[in-house]
Every structure is written in structure tokens, then in C-alpha cells.
């Protein structure tokens, strides 16, 4: 039963569905393709047999089983991507959509798999193209479509848990011989995920003249991507540290017999401000376009364009940022150095950089060749 399901996954992930090839031959062809890919990495599988890779977390047991699990994960990943990449959502309801709305698309990041003894967790991010709704009917249609996709996948619900009806989650449970929990995360903005952001840039480039560095598209990026004020981040960070220290201090002086657990009893996860959450603020981003020009056919020379917004380093505070400057009555400038160690006290220059890098290469949209896009996001 499991082998039949795995062969069916190979069939779904096949790109040669229209070829006049026998079903079994096509399955064997793609099975050999994936096996050849892993065999090229060496017999010891240093690149595959890992405890915690970025997209697959699984425990080490048998080498052959690890290979089979990774192959199955890759096939399931292709299946989920095919389900979510919907290029023309209004094809069955043309009265709801007009013009450019016919090209509405859902972008999905590569699913991440976490294997435990009894459960397989599948987590991925997705985002739809940012287009205006025409009317309420379109809004209802889009909402019902996402609901239908969730029902088909059997997505995990924290209230009702998994839908017990036959869906992809139950189908994959029979394939893995474990319970499968699918948990999609809808991104509010495309720049919340570097892979989705990269895909959306490639999707939009051919709509604007001038390419990545053109006035129209670069202005659109600057207007839609927030670059938060580093000074406000510093002040919020310091204020939260001071408030938390005051809570601990008040608990200690109110009762000297308190244990270490009682000192922190006032901290509630629901009360902790979200200003301290990692990856909340987008500090800067860098985009690199390299390859053939999309708009100009017949140009053989490759071009290279790079955009930089904000900063890719979180060391935003200079050495003397803690100094207080004021002027006397005689209009002379003086410095108060009582606050000179503010960076050392609150470790403002020790915030780690969170770089998310995504590369999209060999895109065949250019008439004269291919191009590649690299996106780097820095968050704090």
C-alpha cells in the first residue's frame, strides 16, 4: 500500500505528464533522477544524513530509511507547491475577476519537515499577490478558496485538531505510517519571508520598465517596505529592559524570603510586550539582479543591478550615541558624559544580525537568456 502511494507521488511530481510514456516507466525515470541526485553527494551522505537541516529535521536511524524519508519529503514538497501555485484563480469564475485580477497568484515557500517517532510536522509559509479586491464577491470567493485548500490539505486546527475526513493529511499519514500535521502560515506581507519575496520580485519584474533599478519599481519597493527608525527601536528595547528589572526588584524588596521562582512570578507570557520579539523589525534589505535584460531583446551583454535599503548590520549605534549635548547661555556646546556607557550597559551594539538569504537563478523570462535574483533581509 505504501509503495503504491509513493509511486503516485512520483506521478504527481512528474513534469512529463503529457509525454506518451508508460506510467511505470515514468515513475522509474523520476525515481532514478532523485536517487542519482543523492548518489552524487557521496556514499556517506554527509549532506543528507543530518540531524537538523534547514528543511528536514529527522532522527538518525538507518541510512536507507533516511534516504527514503528525504525522497518522500521532496515529493510531498513538490505536491504542496503545485497545489498552492495558482496562477489564474478566476478561471472558473470570470465574472468575479477582471483584467490583471485574472493573474492573482499564491506564493509558497519550500515546506519544512520535522519527523518525530509518532508524528510528521509539515510547516510552510504562503502569501497571495497584493492586488485590490474588486468587490465583495471576489473577497468571498478568495476566502472560500483558501478554506477549500485548508480542507483539502487537512490543515491542523488548534481547536478542532485535524479534520478526520479523507484529505491529504490522512493520505500522507498512510504513506509515512505516522500522524501527519500540516500547518500553513499565511504571511501578511511578502517581505516577511525571503523566498516568497524573491519569487514575487521575479514575478513582477516584467510588469515594470527599467528592471529592478528602474524608477517605477524601486519607488514601489521603497513605498511598500517599511524601514523602522533605529532610534525608536533602541528606546523601546531599553524601556522594556528597565521595566522588567523594576518588576524583579520590587518582588525582591517586597519579600526577602522569596525563592528564585517567585521573583519572576509576575512575568506572564501574555503580558510581555511584543517589542522584544526577534525578527519583528525589518532593518534593511539588499537585492541583486544579474543576467540578461528582460525588456530589451537582442542585447547580448549581461547587466548587474543592486539595490540597498536600510542597513544590513544591527550595530546601529555609534560610540558617543549616549552623550547628551546642550548649549550654555553663552552659546557654547557642552557634553554630559554620565550616559556615555549606555551601549555597554544595554548591549545595544551586541544585537545579532538575522540575515535571510534567498537566491533564484536561471529564470527564463528574459528573451535573450536567463537571469538570477538574490535577496538578503536583515531583521531585528
UniProtKB/Swiss-Prot annotation:
Keywords of this protein's UniProt record, alphabetized? Mitochondrion, Ribonucleoprotein, Ribosomal protein
For this chain, the family text in UniProt reads: Belongs to the universal ribosomal protein uS3 family.
| GO CC terms, sorted | mitochondrion; ribonucleoprotein complex; ribosome
**Does the UniProt entry include the keyword Mitochondrion?**
yes
Q: Does Ribonucleoprotein show up as a keyword for this record?
A: yes
Biological role: Essential for mitochondrial protein synthesis and required for the maturation of small ribosomal subunits.
- Organism of origin: Cyberlindnera mrakii
UniProt-annotated location(s): Mitochondrion
What this protein is called in its record is: Small ribosomal subunit protein uS3m
Q: In which broad location class does this protein mainly occur, judging by the first location in its UniProt entry?
A: mitochondrion
Amino acid at each position: 500500500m505504501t509503495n503504491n502511494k509513493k509511486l503516485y507521488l512520483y506521478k504527481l511530481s512528474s513534469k512529463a505528464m503529457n509525454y506518451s510514456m508508460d506510467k511505470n516507466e515514468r515513475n522509474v525515470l523520476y525515481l532514478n533522477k532523485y536517487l542519482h541526485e543523492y548518489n552524487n553527494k557521496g556514499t556517506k551522505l554527509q549532506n543528507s544524513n543530518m540531524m537538523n537541516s534547514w528543511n528536514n529535521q529527522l532522527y538518525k536511524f538507518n541510512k536507507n530509511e533516511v534516504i527514503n524519508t528525504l525522497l518522500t519529503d521532496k515529493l510531498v514538497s513538490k505536491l504542496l507547491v503545485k497545489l498552492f501555485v495558482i496562477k489564474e484563480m478566476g478561471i472558473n469564475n470570470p465574472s468575479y475577476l477582471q483584467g490583471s485580477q485574472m493573474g492573482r497568484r499564491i506564493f509558497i515557500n519550500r515546506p519544512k519537515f520535522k519527523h518525530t517517532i509518532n508524528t510528521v510536522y509539515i510547516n510552510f509559509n504562503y502569501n497571495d499577490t497584493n492586488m485590490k479586491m474588486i468587490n465583495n464577491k471576489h473577497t468571498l470567493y478568495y476566502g472560500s478558496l483558501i478554506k477549500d485548500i485548508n480542507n483539502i490539505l487537512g490543515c491542523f486546527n488548534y481547536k478542532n485538531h485535524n479534520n478526520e475526513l479523507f484529505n491529504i493529511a490522512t493520505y500522507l499519514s498512510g504513506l509515512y505510517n505516522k500522524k501527519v500535521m500540516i500547518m500553513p502560515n499565511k504571511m501578511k506581507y511578502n517581505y516577511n519571508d525571503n523566498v516568497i519575496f524573491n519569487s514575487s520580485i521575479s514575478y513582477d519584474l516584467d510588469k515594470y520598465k527599467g528592471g529592478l533599478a528602474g524608477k517605477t519599481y524601486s519607488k514601489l519597493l521603497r513605498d511598500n517596505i517599511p524601514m523602522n527608525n533605529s532610534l525608536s527601536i533602541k528606546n523601546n528595547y531599553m524601556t522594556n529592559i528597565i521595566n522588567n528589572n523594576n518588576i524583579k526588584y520590587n518582588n525582591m524588596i517586597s519579600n526577602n524570603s522569596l525563592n528564585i521562582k517567585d521573583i519572576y512570578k509576575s512575568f506572564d507570557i501574555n503580558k510581555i510586550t511584543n517589542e522584544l520579539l526577534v525578527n519583528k523589525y525589518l532593518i534593511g534589505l539588499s537585492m541583486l539582479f544579474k543576467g540578461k535584460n528582460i525588456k530589451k531583446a537582442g542585447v547580448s551583454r549581461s547587466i548587474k543591478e543592486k539595490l540597498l535599503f536600510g542597513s544590513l548590520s544591527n550595530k546601529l549605534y555609534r560610540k558617543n550615541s549616549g552623550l547628551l549635548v546642550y548649549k550654555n547661555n553663552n552659546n557654547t556646546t557642552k557634553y554630559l558624559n554620565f550616559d556615555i556607557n549606555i551601549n555597554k550597559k544595554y548591549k545595544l551594539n551586541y544585537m545579532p544580525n538575522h540575515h535571510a538569504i534567498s537566491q533564484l537563478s536561471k529564470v527564463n523570462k528574459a528573451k535573450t537568456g536567463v537571469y538570477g535574483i538574490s535577496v538578503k533581509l536583515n531583521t531585528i
